[in-house]
């Protein structure tokens, strides 16, 4: 039971926009926080003092920045949430990252403000199945090639699997779902071979 949570966070991001966190209270979006580069304090204030389930999720892609939680303090008690016993590892592109879901039209210049993985199928399906989602999604990624403009004829095979996989995963996922191939169409362009 608490009225506020104080976070000390270090954020590392690129020129494509800030790392964005979503704060959920009892599975409802409560607040979004655009993290500033470097180490900063953030306070989440609740209007009433009651038992609640709070989740803090990075909703932007790891390739555009990440955060480190240095400290967490509260005026109440914190107890660990029992995470689901099953998990799904989702490997995908912008569709899995939720890019473009925060805008009426797809923006011409990439910016992290236009993505939210909690509005994309990997997160939503995981919630419906009550499994832990592990989402590794990189906009522009493909199997044969990353996205390329129409003026290019050669595939862009830099930073495709396995080089983009961020770490040796400590989780042992129950299932793995790979949702890649959409960006390959920018290279294959309907070529039959």
Spell out what each predicted region is:
Residues 101, 106-193:
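Conserved SGNH/GDSL esterase-like catalytic core that processes O-acyl groups on lipids
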Residues 1-91, 95-114:
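N-terminal secretory targeting modules
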């Amino acid at each position: 039971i608490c009225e506020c949570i104080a976070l000390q966070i270090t954020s590392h991001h690129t020129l494509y926009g800030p790392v964005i966190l979503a704060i959920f209270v009892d599975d409802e979006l409560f607040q979004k926080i655009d993290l500033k580069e470097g180490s900063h304090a953030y306070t989440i204030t609740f209007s009433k003092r009651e038992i609640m389930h709070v989740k803090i999720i990075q909703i932007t892609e790891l390739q555009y920045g990440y955060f480190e939680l240095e400290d967490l303090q509260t005026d109440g008690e914190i107890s660990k949430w029992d995470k689901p016993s099953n998990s799904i590892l989702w490997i995908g592109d912008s569709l899995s990252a939720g890019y473009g879901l925060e805008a009426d039209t797809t923006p011409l210049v990439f910016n992290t403000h236009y993505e939210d993985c909690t509005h994309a199928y990997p997160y939503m399906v995981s919630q419906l199945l009550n499994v832990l989602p592990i989402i590794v999604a990189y906009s522009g990624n493909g199997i044969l090639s990353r996205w390329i403009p129409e003026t290019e004829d050669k595939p862009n095979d830099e930073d495709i699997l396995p080089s983009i996989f961020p770490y040796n995963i400590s989780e042992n996922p129950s299932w793995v779902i790979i949702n890649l191939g959409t960006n390959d169409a920018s290279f294959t362009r309907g070529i039959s071979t």
